[in-house]
Amino acid sequence: MDTQMARAPLAVRAVLFDLDNTLVDLMGMKRVASDAAARAMLAAGADFPFSADEAGDILFGEYLPDLESDSVFEAFLRKHHRRALGMGQHQVDRITAAAVNAYLRAKMLRTEPYAGVRPTLVALTKAGLRLGVVTDAPRFKAYQRLEAAGLPDFFEFVLTFTDSGERKPAERPFRAALDLLGLPPHQVLMVGDRATQDMAGAKALGLRTAWARYGSPGAPVPLEAEAVLERVEDLIRLIPLAADRR
């Protein structure tokens, strides 16, 4: 934990977690799965003007603007296939299906919590802290990731974009979480990897904030972060784990 921040423990009664790149390594999973999908496209007959390794890198880059996209594979195929204009829909569907299948297989194998997440959640739960998730992911995809990582039972609730209709840093997702907890903002800690969406959004409503540096390596420390987590286990030292919280 950053020794220049949060010198005093944060006395809170609940912890809200972002999901992607905070609890699970979404970017790592997407990179591995994109590589698998690109190789499957080539094996199914795609003709790209670059190598398999380059195809995976390019596909991952085209995923970044919308990590929840369901159409990226067909769009990638039509954009980069040497004879895209001559492809019939059967060929498009076959190659795209191969990509989706390979992507899903890799996704299931690679969707896992960061090291230390489970023991940290166990320690926080045993201490009586209430835990929730506030994510911009759609509900179904959020639960896919949580289930694959074996984490959903740790949380009292999972608030998604499907539920709130707005993405962080809008107030609505955070207010919805506070309403479910029935706690004032200063008794709730928000943990996330994004400066604007997680840290600034939570701080604007008076929540306490801890930035997951491990989920955004190389990014500058957000001004709104009260603490910096080098790894998720730093939460155990950051929050007084009093036995009488319940």
Language-model regions: role of each:
Residues M1-V15, G28, A43-A44, M87, ...:
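Asp-based, Mg2+/Mn2+-dependent phosphohydrolase catalytic module
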Residues R7-A115, F140:
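N-terminal helical cap/lid subdomain that shapes the substrate entry/recognition surface
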